[in-house]
From Swiss-Prot:
Gene name per UniProt: psbD
Keywords: Acetylation, Chlorophyll, Chloroplast, Chromophore, Electron transport, Iron, Magnesium, Membrane, Metal-binding, Oxidoreductase, Phosphoprotein, Photosynthesis, Photosystem II, Plastid, Thylakoid, Transmembrane, Transmembrane helix, Transport
InterPro entries cross-referenced by the UniProt entry: D1/D2 (IPR055266), Photo_II_D1/D2_sf (IPR036854), Photo_RC_L/M (IPR000484), Photo_RC_L/M_CS (IPR055265), PSII_PsbD/D2 (IPR005868)
Record-given protein name: Photosystem II D2 protein
Modified residues (N-acetylthreonine): 2
Further remark: 2 of the reaction center chlorophylls (ChlD1 and ChlD2) are entirely coordinated by water.
Length: 353
């Protein structure tokens, strides 16, 4: 019995092969199979956001002006979430809420679900694009793995959190000031800054910034003089075979500064990948917990003592009172349909006031 080993070749190209050749052709902007998801979704998400911030009011959903047409600027314009009464409706243009009326669809907040869903798929398409290109040029897929961090944060904040609450209403609106207000909401209603997952996220993001600054400075400090150029960018040939900077010198420097240093480039760069991506994933997990109304750290003993002893107060008890004030003010403003009324005497006052 004879077994022939070799690559199977087809006599004719089928439709898939033709599509594959065209999509993955070497061109200025790579398209690829991932581009079939990325480019349309990114186009619709950005187009929806620009349309909403330019023309669409939030009067019917939040009682607010939110467009350039109404006098907002770049920092205050937003594509606002649908009203609380619409719960988790997808708000399809042809759905029972808008019934094909584009103006009514915009008034109800349909652009928010449109931008959120297309934005999520666009981000996923961008990650798949990195996978596809890495496979094409035989690279490892760590760029795509790193980009999973921002995707996890986006999906957890804009989709999973409101799904755990009563509706899309409680997700962030797509705007700068709107995101700031959402952060205040997270603090007031979830005590987010005292959540251990938030702490890990802050450590990851700020730690990554520190690592980038240290790494960039160290490389600049230990560059070899490979040429007589006037600055860093002209002093070496981009196609040179030898190293650009001295890892040995950098290792000796940081060993003297800290007593420890990275011994090789692989471990150094893996650590620079690990710190921010892990921080983003931890933040995303924390937001998933908030969707289920899981609580942050509670120091009840301090709260009880502050309630009993007029002279005892900590930064923690002051922050708890601040959170109560945020809830009292924001709930009445954000949820007028609940007819919430908080008399002056029930608003929180700290012992120091």
């Amino acid at each position: 019995m004879t077994i022939a080993l070799g690559k199977f070749t087809k006599d004719e190209k089928d439709l898939f092969d033709i599509m594959d050749d065209w999509l993955r052709r070497d061109r200025f902007v790579f398209v690829g199979w991932s581009g079939l998801l990325l480019f349309p979704c990114a186009y619709f998400a950005l187009g929806g956001w620009f349309t909403g911030t330019t023309f669409v009011t939030s009067w019917y959903t939040h009682g607010l002006a939110s467009s350039y047409l109404e006098g907002c600027n770049f920092l205050t314009a937003a594509v606002s979430t649908p009203a609380n009464s619409l719960a988790h409706s997808l708000l399809l243009l042809w759905g029972p809420e808008a019934q094909g009326d584009f103006t009514r669809w915009c008034q109800l907040g349909g652009l928010w679900t449109f931008v959120a869903l297309h934005g999520a798929f666009a981000l996923i398409g961008f990650m798949l694009r990195q996978f596809e290109l890495a496979r094409s040029v035989q690279l490892r897929p760590y760029n795509a793995i790193a980009f999973s961090g921002p995707i996890a944060v986006f999906v957890s904040v804009f989709l999973i959190y409101p799904l755990g609450q009563s509706g899309w209403f409680f997700a962030p609106s797509f705007g700068v000031a709107a995101i700031f207000r959402f952060i205040l909401f997270f603090q007031g209603f979830h005590n987010w800054t005292l959540n251990p997952f938030h702490m890990m996220g802050v450590a990851g993001v700020l730690g990554a910034a520190l690592l980038c600054a240290i790494h960039g400075a160290t490389v600049e400090n230990t560059l070899f003089e490979d040429g007589d150029g006037a600055n860093t960018f002209r002093a070496f040939n981009p196609t040179q075979a030898e190293e650009t900077y001295s890892m040995v010198t950098a290792n000796r420097f940081w060993s003297q500064i800290f007593g420890v240093a990275f011994s090789n480039k692989r471990w150094l760069h893996f650590f620079m990948l690990f710190v921010p991506v892990t921080g983003l994933w931890m933040s995303a997990l924390g937001v998933v917990g908030l969707a289920l109304n899981l609580r942050a750290y509670d120091f009840v003993s301090q709260e009880i003592r502050a309630a009993e002893d007029p002279e005892f107060e900590t930064f923690y008890t002051k922050n708890i009172l601040l959170n109560e004030g945020i809830r009292a003010w924001m709930a009445a403003q954000d949820q007028p349909h609940e007819n919430l009324i908080f008399p002056e005497e029930v608003l929180p006052r700290g012992n120091a006031l």
